[in-house]
Amino acid sequence: MRIPRTNHMTEQEGVIKFQLDFSPAPALPASDLLEIGAWRKMLYLTQLIGQTPERYDGYGFGNISRRLPPFDAPRHQRRFVISGTQTGNLAELRPEHYAVVLAYYPARNLIAGEGPIRPSSESLTHGMVYDMDATAQWVMHAHSPHIWCAARSFGIPM
């Protein structure tokens, strides 16, 4: 597997907090993104993904990913497509708004990815979820003040 080595960066403004080895690459075909696009739109319409000046200092919030084959890949190399960084303000994502994470190394705080956009700031978290359960196919990271405020009444441990 090729791991790109073109662009080391850590953004300091509060979004990306990992080292990123990123290579610009063409977008995945639109036909490969129909299902992730439909789920992402549902999360956007229910305000679980979005961007508003009132929340998180105006940064976008929430993201979505889906595992890519091969599904028997070893830990830290379970590829996935993920929404690009700071795309929360967009009602619908086009292929150029998704990145592919090729590998992730938590001990080194490093993501290797490619695509037309840099991957979400939560890419390392998504990778760890896929490592915790090799059968996991999706990660949907949503933000809901309503659920958070009502967590105790729902029996959600805090």
Predicted regions span which residues?
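Glycine-rich flexible loops
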Residues: 2-158
